[in-house]
A protein has these predicted regions:
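C-terminal beta-strand edge segments of enzyme domains
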Residues: 1, 66-127
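Active-site beta-loop-alpha substructure in enzyme catalytic cores
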Residues: 1-63
Length: 127
């Protein structure tokens, strides 16, 4: 986890997004930041999982996905900012674009206090 501008970020890389256990929130971060290289055939999976991680962890999610082509694949982009309710705040579509948005940690804390689902998660240890 890193903190920047008063926001605590959990860092994920590409394929990590597929595994909810890696991003399990215990109230210790405010946003997920995921840099990725998801190919175009899996664009809907990328978009869906980014939203799912935000919803299930009651956090913001920022996903930066590759665009363009290489000999192995075409990359669709679809970078996005998603809020803790799964609503898209900004999206880049298929091109290169700088996305901006405000991660309101006060609104996030109020939502978590009103609906503290993250407290009901089972404790476990990964080995």
């Amino acid at each position: 986890m890193v903190e920047y501008g008063g926001v605590r970020f959990l860092l994920l890389v590409c394929y990590d997004l597929r595994f909810p256990v890696w991003s399990r929130c215990r109230g210790d971060y405010d946003a997920i930041l995921c840099c990725a290289s998801w190919p175009a055939p899996r664009r809907e999976v990328w978009r869906t999982l980014l939203r799912a991680r935000a919803i299930e962890n009651q956090c913001y999610a920022a996903g930066a996905n590759r665009v363009g082509d290489d000999p192995a694949a075409r990359y669709a982009g679809d970078s996005a900012l998603v809020d803790f309710k799964g609503r898209t705040m900004a999206e880049a579509g298929g091109g290169e674009r700088i996305l901006t948005g405000v991660f309101d940690t006060g609104a996030l804390a109020a939502f978590r206090e009103k609906f503290p689902a993250w407290r009901d998660a089972d404790e476990f240890v990964l080995k």
